[in-house]
């Protein structure tokens, strides 16, 4: 398989302990997503040899780089106070747990498929803000945020599903995010 595209970074409010999602939205346009799982490891040595080895998931580091960070993200993800065209930051604001998904296009044996991923419990933190003058060439500055994904009490931390069409992948992300049809 070869991944050839990335789109639709989806965020949804996570309500615990029911672990349900609501109010999904597209968090800008995806530029890059990095997911790096972290593991706890242990070895048992007996009779002068390695007798056992275990490795289990702890959490995953996530970096999300998008074209923009919508105002809605500041409220749902970071706990800031928002209005239609403004964000107010307070020292007491706390990041909230969310569900996070996205879709990638891939080619498998020459056939295009769409893979959607959903991470069940993620807490993002705001990144460094950087601004530059325009200068002779146009250089885009885009927001990048980091976070950690962790497992739910039942051990699930991520789902991945492959679809024949992009529309099916997007519908699955919307469903995972708790979108209801009106």
Regions found by a protein language model. Name each.
Residues 1-76, 123-139:
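Solvent-exposed edge beta-strands and adjacent loop segments
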Residues 3, 77-80, 91-105, 132-143, ...:
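Repeat-unit-sized solenoid/scaffold elements
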Residues 4, 9-12, 51, 89, ...:
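Hydrophobic transmembrane signal anchors and adjacent membrane-proximal interface regions, especially
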Residues 9-11, 110-112, 145-149:
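Short secondary-structure transition/capping segments
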Residues 22-26, 114-121, 159-163:
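Short amphipathic beta-strand/extended segments with alternating polar/hydrophobic composition
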Residues 52-118:
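Structured, beta-strand-rich domain cores
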Residues 122-182:
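Mixed-charge, glycine-accented linear interaction segment located at domain edges/termini
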């Amino acid at each position: 398989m070869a991944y050839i595209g990335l789109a639709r970074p989806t965020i949804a409010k996570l309500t615990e302990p029911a672990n349900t999602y609501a109010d999904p939205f597209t968090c800008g346009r995806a530029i890059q997503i990095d997911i790096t799982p972290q593991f706890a490891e242990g070895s048992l040595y007996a009779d002068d040899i390695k007798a056992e080895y275990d490795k289990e998931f702890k959490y995953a580091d996530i970096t999300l780089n998008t074209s923009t960070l919508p105002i809605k993200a500041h409220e749902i993800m970071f706990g800031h106070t928002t209005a239609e065209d403004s964000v107010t930051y307070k020292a007491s604001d706390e990041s909230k747990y969310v569900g996070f998904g996205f879709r990638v296009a891939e080619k498998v044996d020459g056939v295009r498929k769409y893979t959607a991923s959903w991470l069940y419990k993620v807490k993002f933190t705001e990144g460094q803000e950087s601004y530059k003058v325009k200068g002779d060439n146009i250089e885009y500055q885009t927001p990048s945020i980091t976070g950690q994904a962790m497992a739910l009490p039942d051990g699930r931390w991520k789902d991945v599903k492959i679809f024949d069409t992009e529309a099916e992948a997007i519908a699955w992300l919307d469903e995972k995010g708790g979108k209801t049809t009106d």
